[in-house]
Amino acid sequence: MKTSAALLFLVSLASAAPMTPSPAAEAAAVLEGRQIQTLCDQYGYWSGNGYYVNNNMWGKDSGSGSQCTYIDSSSANHVSWRSTWQWSGGQNNVKSYPYSGRTIQRGRTIASINSMPSVVQWNYNNGNIRANVAYDLFTSTDPNRDNTHGDYELMVWLGRYGDVQPIGSQIGNANVGGRNWQLWSGLNNGMRVYSFVTTQGAITYFNADIKQFFTYLQQSQGFPASQQYLTTFQFGTEPFTGGQTTFQVNSFGANVQ
């Protein structure tokens, strides 16, 4: 997880040379009250109003860089946040997945869910990067499984920057929700990962029922919807490499009905 919100920085005029602040310096320079909370720790976490945000630099040791995430506003209907990062090295390794998530009631199988409406608006202020922008949902036969793994993972790539690609290989094409997608499939430590990748460029405004993707997998790939419990419902970005950039989520809203 975007039209950019203006960032106000304290700029020193003592030197004529322009300086680009690191994410940590940016956090200190943002005027007090500009955001609800700043997250610069590896797994910095915030929650409120049925949503949560995680800085989630899980792969940071595969390269070098920095990242901070800022929660700008939240309500019962949405959360607004942004993440500023810069990463180098480990060309083909994901460095992080800063994300927003919807707090869900555990114990519901995919088959028992009628719909999963979600609306998101986002953008990147620098396209010269290698990263994706994607929904990420886990399911498991254990309704109480932790939210870092599952039996199945569903990713919906709304943005693809550079030569990055999903886990596995492309197994076909799909039309879901009136849009065309590449369908990829692969294994990640025993977890089956299905990725729907946009074929129409970045989708910066997306309003859809995510349940439709599970229905497609049930019908075409034999996904066991009656045996799999939903454990996460998240949206964010996976940076690989790139100079300092800001991923802005103007609004992320989701529900499980």
From Swiss-Prot:
Under Gene3D superfamilies, the record lists: 2.60.120.180
Major localization listed first in the record, in broad terms: secreted
Activity-pH behavior: Optimum pH is 6.0-7.5.
State how activity varies with temperature. Optimum temperature is 30-50 degrees Celsius.
Q: What is its EC class?
A: hydrolase
Which EC number(s) does the record attach to this protein? 3.2.1.4
* GO biological process terms on file: cellulose catabolic process
Matching InterPro entries? ConA-like_dom_sf (IPR013320), GH11/12 (IPR013319), GH12 (IPR002594)
Q: Which GO terms describe its cellular component?
A: extracellular region
Renumbered to this chain, the signal peptide range is 1-16
Reported induction: Levels of expression are constitutively high during infection and spore formation.
The molecular function terms of the Gene Ontology recorded here are: cellulase activity
The subcellular location is: Secreted
Q: Which reaction does it catalyse?
A: Endohydrolysis of (1->4)-beta-D-glucosidic linkages in cellulose, lichenin and cereal beta-D-glucans
The record's keywords, sorted A to Z, are: Carbohydrate metabolism, Cellulose degradation, Glycosidase, Hydrolase, Polysaccharide degradation, Secreted, Signal
**Which family is this protein grouped under?**
Belongs to the glycosyl hydrolase 12 (cellulase H) family.
Q: What does this protein do?
A: Endoglucanase that functions in part to hydrolyze 1,3-1,4-beta-glucan during infection and spore formation. Shows preferential hydrolysis of barley beta-glucan and lichenan.
What PANTHER family does the database record attribute to this sequence? BLR1656 PROTEIN (PTHR34002), PUTATIVE-RELATED (PTHR34002:SF10)
Please state what the protein is called: Endoglucanase cel12A
Gene field = cel12A
